[in-house]
UniProtKB/Swiss-Prot annotation:
InterPro entries on file: SBP_5, SBP_5_dom, SgrR_HTH_N, Tscrpt_reg_SgrR, WH_DNA-bd_sf
UniProt cross-references to SUPFAM superfamilies, sorted A to Z: Periplasmic binding protein-like II, Winged helix' DNA-binding domain
NCBIfam families with a match to the protein in the record: PRK13626.1 (NF010149)
Any one Gene Ontology molecular-function term assigned to this protein's record: peptide transmembrane transporter activity
Highest taxon of the lineage: Bacteria
Protein name as it appears in the record: HTH-type transcriptional regulator SgrR
Region (Solute-binding): 163-493
Organism, as annotated: Salmonella choleraesuis (strain SC-B67)
Keyword Transcription regulation listed: yes
DNA-binding region: 26-49
Biological processes, Gene Ontology terms: negative regulation of DNA-templated transcription; peptide transport; positive regulation of DNA-templated transcription
The HTH marR-type domain, residue ranges: 1-116
């Protein structure tokens, strides 16, 4: 019998007998465990051989045998829990222990660095699973980061300085205002073993032509081996950066025929997905990666939803603290939480409603009514970026007849719930009921349901001149809520003729967007880890991090 199953049977037997020595029979014990008399004898003999109990069998009618426990069920449960942790079986651990608080403490004690069979393993605790990792779909902040570890693209944007770097393409050039040429590396392999071919690249870039930022791509062809030409309908100075974004990551052309591709995608990046369940995401270093092989062999993201109830539910990779080893990496996000007024509803489009609501739900009001732990993580926002002060809040008069408003945000985001509760209380003081809708991220991203206002958070990556417009333009919700000529805006941006500060100020001037809070991103980690540089998404590049060996 497998060790895990035997441990479960012992724990169950110990619980049924209250851990007490007793005189009993095989039949009575078999009834307790719902098994046959013969199987019960086998179980007792095996448990006795393990040193967990003694079984003094008596033969004869009416005679009772003595069962003595040498091991407690709690001790064995702890041992079983340790085994499950080492095997990364978090789902079974939750079932075994039951108490989420106890599971959390066990997980935290095993976070950080582990060295097993010559392999460096990093364990990370996170507050939600990541079911969808498919480029070109609606991806949240963490999914965006993980996709960058799994996939490669023609170019790569350096997370620390925003500079453009080679990836699948080793060089590129602008042949004419409407034609760019990229030169690709040969010999690149997908995680499932097949070699990358030009058809994979063409198919990947063709499939995203429906996205607003890629809609100006008119034709993609390969004039010679490992040479890719991209034809445009309008000039785009940002195209090389655009082709380094997650939607433009390269997929194998047969991806739609591969089972569960969204949760178990196959790319050419430094890490390959080994497991992705509601309790765990495990990625392994890809030995055949065409770049520098990752120094951390395995990254395990353990999922425990209950940690999201804490305000500082950022990335946690803090193991046992030894000699003041603990370190906290933090940065003020390049972005903010903001309110988005929906011009498709009468209340959302009404200028007086926008003015009054933005006054009542001002950043200072939200901060004042937040709990102290959150006040330490929040900073009032008066622009989309921390250094901008574009918002001009006014006093505003409450519009006559305003009795209710609808607010919508996406699920699995504790701070959204906290902000919504504060907003509800503030509006209730003025006899306005806030109807709150929590929906899936896909629904939120599409923005096709009715809502007066929407709650969102934006994290802009480097370079900001690129990502600020690119991020806002690629979310259908914003284009649905804000009536303006987005195509004309995109043409100006591509031509390098857009003043982004002025453009953002226009969005804030009519209260289409109302900044609320800048948030401190936090990584709780260990000083033994080197190369950890928090990016603007609140994560770090796994392949560049490494562990310093212990002192001799």
């Amino acid at each position: 019998m497998p060790s895990g199953r035997l441990q479960q049977q012992f724990i169950r037997l110990w619980q049924c007998c209250d851990g007490k020595t007793q005189d009993t029979t095989l039949n009575e014990l078999a009834d307790l465990l719902n098994c046959s008399r013969r199987h019960m004898r086998t179980l007792l003999n095996t448990m006795q051989a393990r040193g967990w109990l003694t079984w003094e069998a008596e033969v004869g009618r009416g005679k009772r045998s003595r069962l003595t426990f040498l091991y407690t069920g709690l001790a064995l449960q702890q041992q079983r829990a340790e085994d499950l942790l080492e095997q990364d079986r978090i789902d079974q651990l939750v079932q075994l222990v039951g108490d989420k608080s106890a599971v959390r403490q066990m997980l935290i004690s095993h976070l950080g660095r582990s060295f097993r069979q010559g392999r460096h393993i990093l364990r990370v605790l996170y507050y939600r699973p990541m079911h969808n990792l498919l480029p070109g779909t609606a991806l949240r902040r963490s999914e965006t980061h993980i996709a960058r570890q799994i996939f490669s693209s023609l170019t790569r944007v350096n997370e620390e300085n925003g500079e453009l770097e080679a990836d699948i393409a080793h060089h590129w050039q602008q042949i004419s205002p409407l034609l760019w040429r990229f030169y690709l590396r040969p010999g690149i392999h997908f995680h499932h073993g097949r070699e990358l071919e030009m058809e994979d690249v063409i198919a990947s870039l063709t499939r995203i032509n429906t996205l607003p930022l890629y809609s100006h791509i008119t034709k993609i062809d390969s004039p010679t081996a490992w040479t890719l030409d991209i034809h445009l309908s309008q000039p785009d100075r940002w195209l090389p950066w655009l082709l380094g974004q997650v939607p433009a990551m390269i997929l194998s052309r047969e991806w739609e025929t591969l089972a569960n591709f969204a949760s178990h995608p196959i790319g050419t990046g430094p890490y390959a997905v080994r497991r992705n369940t509601p309790n765990q995401l495990k990625i392994l270093a890809f030995d055949d990666y065409f770049g520098y092989r990752a120094l951390i062999d395995e990254v395990n993201v353990w999922v425990l939803p209950d940690i999201s109830e804490e305000p500082a539910c950022g990335l946690m990779l803090e193991g046992p603290i030894q000699g003041g080893e603990k370190a906290i990496e933090s940065r003020l996000e390049k972005g903010c939480y903001y309110l988005l007024f929906d011009a498709r509803t009468p209340r959302g489009a009404h200028p007086q409603v926008r003015e009054w609501v933005s006054h009542v739900l001002s950043p200072t009001n939200l901060l004042y009514h937040a709990d102290e732990p959150l006040q330490q993580l929040w900073f009032p926002a008066y622009g989309l970026l921390p250094r901008w002060h574009h918002a001009r809040p006014g006093p505003g008069e409450k519009p006559a007849g305003l009795e209710t408003l609808t607010l919508t945000f996406y699920r699995e985001h504790i701070e959204h719930r906290v902000i919504a509760r504060i907003m509800s209380a503030l509006l209730a003081e003025h006899q306005v009921h806030l109807h709150i809708q929590e929906i899936d991220y896909d629904q939120w991203h599409a923005g096709e349901i009715e809502s007066d206002i929407w709650l969102n958070s934006a994290n802009f990556t480097l370079p900001l001149d690129f990502s600020l417009f690119a991020h806002l333009c690629e979310v259908p919700l914003l284009q649905n809520c804000i009536p303006r000529d987005w195509q004309d805006d995109a043409a100006q941006w591509r031509a390098g003729e857009m003043n982004l500060a002025n453009w953002c100020q226009q969005l804030l001037a009519n209260k289409a967007i109302v900044p609320l809070i800048h948030h401190w991103l936090i990584i709780q980690g260990q000083r033994s880890m080197r190369g950890l540089r928090m990016n603007t998404l609140g994560w770090f590049d796994f392949k560049s991090a490494w562990f310093a060996p212990p002192d001799p």
